[in-house]
């Protein structure tokens, strides 16, 4: 049990350091973690952590190349601000079309797919900012359309 707490502390410290956006090399991250009391940390472990958490090198405000973490997406839920990414929902006789903020369609489609057939969703196809979804057997297009409006708290 003590080991997992130590690991959690390491992950928390690692993420906090990367949020500072001032480390341009893995050795700088190793040194900073060692300064925080993680004596057993090495470059190889930092490299694995950078990969695991999807860290990327980008330019900070001072135009220096630094490591940083992408915005955390996690598993989407309907109570999260994802509903703010849905701009418009419409339908015809065959499909429901959902327009999202640029880049958000695949995330919203993932949420819809996770609800599955029991909620009336046969499947989704997502581009960058548009999603097509079709109802499962036993559900009408209009029923699914109304369920999606409720899900994302859109106006009926």
Swiss-Prot record:
- Which pathway does this polypeptide act in? Amino-acid biosynthesis; L-arginine biosynthesis [regulation]
Question: What Gene Ontology terms describe what this protein does at the molecular function level?
Answer: arginine binding; DNA binding; DNA-binding transcription factor activity
Identify the keywords attached in UniProt to this record, alphabetized: Amino-acid biosynthesis, Arginine biosynthesis, Cytoplasm, DNA-binding, Repressor, Transcription, Transcription regulation
Q: Which Gene3D superfamilies does the UniProt record give? A: 3.30.1360.40, Winged helix-like DNA-binding domain superfamily/Winged helix DNA-binding domain (1.10.10.10)
InterPro entries associated with the record: Arg_repress, Arg_repress_C, Arg_repress_C_sf, Arg_repress_DNA-bd, WH-like_DNA-bd_sf, WH_DNA-bd_sf
| Gene Ontology biological-process annotations | L-arginine biosynthetic process; protein complex oligomerization; regulation of arginine biosynthetic process
Q: What SUPFAM superfamilies does the annotation carry?
A: C-terminal domain of arginine repressor, Winged helix' DNA-binding domain
Subcellular localization: Cytoplasm
Q: Name one GO cellular component term.
A: cytoplasm
Superkingdom of origin organism? Bacteria
Q: What does this protein do?
A: Regulates arginine biosynthesis genes.
To which protein family does this belong? Answer: Belongs to the ArgR family.
Q: What is this protein called?
A: Arginine repressor
Q: Which organism is it from?
A: Pectobacterium carotovorum subsp. carotovorum (strain PC1)
Lineage of the source organism?
Bacteria, Pseudomonadati, Pseudomonadota, Gammaproteobacteria, Enterobacterales
Gene behind this protein: argR
């Amino acid at each position: 049990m003590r080991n997992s707490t130590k690991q959690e502390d390491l992950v928390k410290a690692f993420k906090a350091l990367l949020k500072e956006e001032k480390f341009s090399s893995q050795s700088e991250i190793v040194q900073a973690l060692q300064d925080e009391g993680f004596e057993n940390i090495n470059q190889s472990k930092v490299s694995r952590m950078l990969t695991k958490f999807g860290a990327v090198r980008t330019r900070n405000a001072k135009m220096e190349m630094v490591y940083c973490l992408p915005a955390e997406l996690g598993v989407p839920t309907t109570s999260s601000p994802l509903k703010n990414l849905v701009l418009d929902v419409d339908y015809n006789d065959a499909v429901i079309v959902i327009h999202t903020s640029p880049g958000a369609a695949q995330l919203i489609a993932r949420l819809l797919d996770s609800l599955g057939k029991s909620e009336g969703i046969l499947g989704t196809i997502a581009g960058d900012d548009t999603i097509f979804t079709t109802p499962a057997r036993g559900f009408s297009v209009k029923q699914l359309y109304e369920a999606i409006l409720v899900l994302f708290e859109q106006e009926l």
